[in-house]
């Protein structure tokens, strides 16, 4: 079922949030009013991507389903109609980006991983334009290991040891093997150590008989330059050059610990829970134990970490006392840390979050602040209020018993108010509510199947008592023998993504663990996450003052082209100018409009795909073309540091070595039947005929003439009017669509055009006069494109003009009143290939079916009865298949279910 049918049957059922009992004070009523206004004006969208696999290899396809929700109850969003999904490379640059239409909050897409991509830790990032106004921590941002056995069959085995001397010396040992474990002996290895963008060491080594190199370096600023990478350039015996990036997560064994009093402060005379978090220098939790001592050296309390370096203890702090923690870490190191200062005046919260039906909140005040006053508790998330109540203090405390049934699942902020509008204490909790989860069962007609046998999967969502059982779902089936996975705690899941990670500041270690087989102990562990990482997105000072957050990016409802028409070489707007847009593709014909009094024009509700080029033409009111057209450009989202950086894998090829072997077998079989282009690792050494061609003034970073193909002026046909026409059919491994060149290695990514050293869009090719061209150099092989990094991932065409040393040819392409425009359109989603072995005449029936992703079904929608089904055929290899289904229903209930079958 496709997106359009889903739109036709999906009706989002909004419902109101129940408020609490208790008579509020005028101050609280004002706060609640401001919170409501904030929630209405700045609703929070979240994104989850369901991927078909937890990791990939170069040559693979990444298949994903996107879910965009809004508000605390995770209802499918109608606010934004466009989703951006980026694949960010190890160099922290965007390698691929797609723009996808959202239909009732859902979409689907894919990435093709070209052979030119290197091994490394990639990131898949998703967001709407509206989400860009807020902290990037709310983006969907996941570390994605991608291995390479197509153009890089070298497996690195890295280890780093540290000496915590004043200069922090690091000893590195790296062993290089092939996928079968054989060593790469006598291989030259050039290395460069980069920490936080600074080069701190470089050198050259040759591997020994076991394929090993070893070198030392010193990080003189270990507390400023905490992480980095080792860049390797390897020269193999068969004259290949392989580049690798090995993450260097730390250069120190220095551990740290922080203490977090519940609700922010230790209030004298009150039992106080203090959480703590111990971290190794790589940002991962480390085991620790210790004791708390007062100023007299008396042991007051003891503590020990639970999971991920976190834990908590309780004691009664005394006024005027100072407390120190003595800690021993799991690696044997020790430290002493002062606890926060004890406060003699103030407020505090104590929360019991372990009861099934209610939440107990105790509000404490110091004696000087009691005086029979009232205190108010507000439970909210990003301005959406779920509970508000005011109680009079009895002595120095007030107790609130809050029913859980009306609280949504996920992160909730508890805020305490006294006699003013600014909070006096805050505490974050995670609320568990089964009503926020959609019951989902998976059934197959059998539990055991033969090879290449049809499997029918039946899904049942919800229960008969539900008012609606319509749900949007997606299913991924993988062969676990060919795609080995761990216990699943390192995989992504819809539960932690939408309920936890998007509402927590910073890195959460293995968030899926808290939702896999949850029990009382894991509830306590999750509460430690809240105590150590909970934060408020509300700036209370600004809220009370009526100061609004800056909104730069509006929710996008459709594709648009807009801009302003001005007098030529000036800034004076031209009103009533006629503006016409014409697409060069088949999606859109001609559309025109008239500028307003400010000279502005806007074409909205457009529908076009990525490879569409537009000509925008303007004429003034009298039909004259002596005007300038300036188009609006929304800047692309910058690549910021990922909060999930500690999830990076040090040696990707090694970590998924079994998978890479399996994909090699699969790719070889596909190549045999012409379904995949064969990779030639030695393309870079082909020098026949090419060296005879003289290339002058070339900006080729590999050196003039060092290309996969060179076309000279003499070879260009002068019977063509534009360069793209001249080159069609002449460039090996290059196809043209609408005048735009694509390498057959990366058929969905335009080649990078470099004109006299200036980087240009591929769509500029038709505007270049072929009579002015001296040479055209084509770079397709990894050996030639590697130096261009992510800019060369789709291939490079280097054009040198006959005045190539002038450096300004590209800027001379100008026509008054007309501009060409190649905006990012919608990505044209491909369909997952699913073989049908019931068709005996299938020409591919003899091919070995070595799929790793057995099936991908992104468009499942259950009916009113909660039922849906899909089918697929098993593959060639025996083993255990995992069927994982995720999604949510129209009420925002989240669904996740797993089922296993055996193939013999």
What is each of the regions a protein language model found here?
Residues 84-88, 190-192, 289-293, 376-380, ...:
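Beta-strand signatures of extracellular beta-sandwich domains
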Residues 737, 741-782, 806-814:
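Periplasmic plug
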Residues 66, 126, 174, 232-234, ...:
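Hydrophobic/tyrosine-rich beta-strand signature of extracellular beta-sandwich/beta-rich modules
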Residues 25-45, 50, 56-57, 63-101, ...:
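Contiguous segments within soluble domain cores/interaction surfaces
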Residues 38-42, 53, 57, 114-119, ...:
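Surface-exposed, low-complexity/disordered segments
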Residues 1-30:
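Bacterial Sec-dependent N-terminal signal peptides
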Residues 109-113, 122-123:
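Ligand-binding face of N-terminal immunoglobulin V-set domains in extracellular IgSF glycoproteins
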Residues 102-108, 200, 207-214, 305-310, ...:
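Short, solvent-exposed loop/turn segments in extracellular or other extracytoplasmic domains
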